[in-house]
């Protein structure tokens, strides 16, 4: 039986010490001070990555100690494969993309995805291969500020898949600024005018990751949300009024773009709309998207949103509360498990603490957050970054095991991340 599955934590501590000693012996400290310090070769921590992941999912304390020096090198391997010469067949195979619909149920219910990205190339590839299926369609918005090398790498990957494309118009996206909303509108226009059929659209960013399978997502949509949009939110609370009553402008310090408040107060909402406040995440029907792109109220609301703070947290939920909008939910509140986020403001109340670190008041997950993530009822989790690569590596192995466990077609060998999985299958009901 694997040491990491042992019930006594003392065994895990011994394992951690043993691995550390082995790494130290393989990478002794240089006696030449000018050579600088050496670090354990991260690849040495990959003997049993699934077993370490299993221990992390089970919340074993010793596994957290091991994870501190086992920084998975997976990201650099992914980027290297993208830059290596070769054909698209090799790329899809080596990057473990699933190349066939996994069931008739999924094949007849195509989804559309809008993915906005600006950094973290390896994380984007991991996200894309987790949500990719050939019957779906994907619009990728690459931030206009992104480095040329990054844009080229994304384009080379996208070129290998007929149902993935870069948005026709790119924006310089600002945190809480209008251009994030505009970027998604641009993708919606492209999706509506594409040759692909799709029933619902889901928006993601490059630091998100699925915690439900494609089949799970479809069944969730078809449950109480059938033909309805999912836009969690409520009537704008008084504490949030300044976000829309005061104008905001975007400015660029040292290449970054931010939205900053002005002292000028703005006009009332168009058409006497009641403003709602909610999540920036959504699942929208195609008919609602077509409504957003053509309805006068939606267009006027978009113009009105150009200089408010965080317009994406007002725009979708406000329009989805209109009684005559397709698939609207006028009386809904915060219902809808779209994205799991640990907010700083909720720590100690509705959420346990962030085991990683907070950035912009939301948790960037660490290994200690994995048990909470996989128990969440949400479809996706946010947010992840390359500082803790093992988190996404573990999560995608767990997710792929679930995906293939639901498959109703023969599996291809390259759909697996390795020939034999050591992940604890009890984690995948």
UniProtKB/Swiss-Prot annotation:
<feature type="disulfide bond">
    <location>
        <begin position="363"/>
        <end position="394"/>
    </location>
</feature>
<keyword id="KW-0328">Glycosyltransferase</keyword>
<dbReference type="GO" id="GO:0000139">
    <property type="term" value="C:Golgi membrane"/>
</dbReference>
<keyword id="KW-0472">Membrane</keyword>
<dbReference type="GO" id="GO:0008375">
    <property type="term" value="F:acetylglucosaminyltransferase activity"/>
</dbReference>
<keyword id="KW-0333">Golgi apparatus</keyword>
<feature type="topological domain" description="Cytoplasmic">
    <location>
        <begin position="1"/>
        <end position="8"/>
    </location>
</feature>
<keyword id="KW-1133">Transmembrane helix</keyword>
<keyword id="KW-0735">Signal-anchor</keyword>
<feature type="glycosylation site" description="N-linked (GlcNAc...) asparagine">
    <location>
        <position position="272"/>
    </location>
</feature>
<comment type="pathway">
    <text>Protein modification; protein glycosylation.</text>
</comment>
<comment type="similarity">
    <text>Belongs to the glycosyltransferase 14 family.</text>
</comment>
<feature type="disulfide bond">
    <location>
        <begin position="53"/>
        <end position="205"/>
    </location>
</feature>
<feature type="topological domain" description="Extracellular">
    <location>
        <begin position="26"/>
        <end position="429"/>
    </location>
</feature>
<feature type="disulfide bond">
    <location>
        <begin position="160"/>
        <end position="187"/>
    </location>
</feature>
<dbReference type="Pfam" id="PF02485">
    <property type="entry name" value="Branch"/>
</dbReference>
<feature type="transmembrane region" description="Helical; Signal-anchor for type II membrane protein">
    <location>
        <begin position="9"/>
        <end position="25"/>
    </location>
</feature>
<feature type="disulfide bond">
    <location>
        <begin position="139"/>
        <end position="354"/>
    </location>
</feature>
<keyword id="KW-0808">Transferase</keyword>
<dbReference type="GO" id="GO:0006486">
    <property type="term" value="P:protein glycosylation"/>
</dbReference>
<protein>
    <recommendedName>
        <fullName>Probable beta-1,3-galactosyl-O-glycosyl-glycoprotein beta-1,6-N-acetylglucosaminyltransferase 7</fullName>
        <ecNumber>2.4.1.-</ecNumber>
    </recommendedName>
</protein>
<comment type="function">
    <text>Probable glycosyltransferase.</text>
</comment>
<keyword id="KW-0812">Transmembrane</keyword>
<dbReference type="InterPro" id="IPR003406">
    <property type="entry name" value="Glyco_trans_14"/>
</dbReference>
<feature type="glycosylation site" description="N-linked (GlcNAc...) asparagine">
    <location>
        <position position="87"/>
    </location>
</feature>
<keyword id="KW-0325">Glycoprotein</keyword>
<keyword id="KW-1015">Disulfide bond</keyword>
């Amino acid at each position: 039986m694997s040491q990491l599955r042992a019930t006594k934590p003392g065994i895990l501590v011994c394992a951690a010490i043993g691995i550390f000693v082995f790494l130290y012996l393989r990478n002794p400290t240089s006696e030449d001070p000018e050579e600088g310090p050496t670090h354990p070769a991260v690849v040495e921590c990959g003997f049993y990555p699934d077993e370490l992941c299993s221990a992390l999912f089970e919340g074993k304390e010793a596994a957290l100690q091991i994870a501190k020096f086992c920084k998975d090198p997976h990201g650099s391997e992914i980027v290297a494969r993208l830059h290596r010469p070769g054909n698209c067949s090799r790329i899809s195979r080596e990057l473990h993309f699933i190349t066939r619909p996994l069931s008739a149920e999924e094949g007849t219910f195509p989804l559309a995805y809008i993915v906005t990205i600006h950094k973290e190339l390896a994380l984007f590839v991991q996200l894309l291969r987790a949500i990719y299926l050939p019957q779906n369609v994907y619009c990728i918005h690459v931030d206009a500020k992104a480095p040329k090398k990054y844009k080229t790498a994304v384009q080379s990957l996208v070129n290998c898949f007929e149902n993935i494309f870069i948005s026709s118009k790119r924006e310089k996206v600002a945190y809480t600024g209008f251009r994030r909303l505009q970027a998604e509108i641009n993708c919606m226009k492209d999706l509506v005018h594409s040759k692909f059929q799709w029933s619902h659209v889901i928006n993601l960013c490059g630091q998100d990751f699925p915690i439900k399978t494609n089949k799970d997502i479809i069944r969730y949509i078809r449950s109480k949300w059938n033909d309805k949009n999912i836009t969690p939110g409520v009537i704008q609370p008084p504490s949030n009024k300044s976000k829309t009553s005061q104008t905001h402008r975007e400015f660029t310090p040292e290449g970054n773009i931010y939205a900053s408040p002005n002292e000028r107060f703005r006009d009332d909402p168009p058409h006497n709309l009641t403003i709602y406040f909610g999540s920036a995440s959504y699942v929208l029907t195609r008919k609602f998207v077509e409504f957003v792109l053509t309805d006068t109220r939606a267009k006027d609301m978009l113009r009105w949103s150009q200089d408010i703070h965080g317009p994406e947290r007002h725009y979708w939920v406000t329009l989805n509360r209109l009684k005559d909008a397709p698939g609207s939910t006028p009386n809904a509140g915060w219902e809808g498990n779209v994205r799991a986020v640990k907010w700083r403001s909720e720590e100690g109340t509705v959420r346990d603490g962030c085991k990683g670190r907070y950035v912009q008041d939301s948790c960037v997950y660490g290994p200690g957050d994995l048990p909470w993530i996989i128990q969440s009822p949400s479809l996706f989790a946010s947010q992840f970054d390359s500082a803790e690569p093992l988190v996404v590596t573990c999560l995608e192995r767990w997710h792929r095991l679930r995906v293939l466990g639901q498959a109703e077609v023969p599996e291809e060998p390259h759909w697996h991340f390795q020939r034999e999985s050591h992940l604890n299958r009890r984690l995948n009901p």
